[in-house]
Amino acid sequence: MVFIEFLNGLNFEPIRITSFFNIVMVWNRGVSFGLFGSGEELTRWLLTFFAFAVSIGLVFWIRMQTKTTAVVALGLVVGGAVGNAVDRIVYGAVADFFDVHVAGYSWPAFNIADSAITVGVILLVLDALLTPKSD
């Protein structure tokens, strides 16, 4: 939260880190790619409720897991979802600050919580694909 307060207080232009990576400050009132970003209070609280509800369900799923990979992957998803939900509660929007752009294409800004969710989902998919099926 200190980092977000710092970035928000700067009112800065994007900070160039590399030729393809900047630090920016974007307030996302929706979800991925700004979907459901109407900015209305009802949407904010519905998204927050949904994130917590899904997280609770995933915690129950974690408790049933025996594989470390699945536990870590689900933990990343839960951590990311809760992190973004806390942003919504505290700030009214999710603070996104990583900007990646390559060959004229710019990916929508994202944050550490988004990265955790993405890595967690990738690990879950890989685990499902690489685990031998038992008969």
Predicted features and spans:
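Alpha-helical transmembrane bundles and membrane-interface segments of multipass inner-membrane proteins
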Residues: 1-135
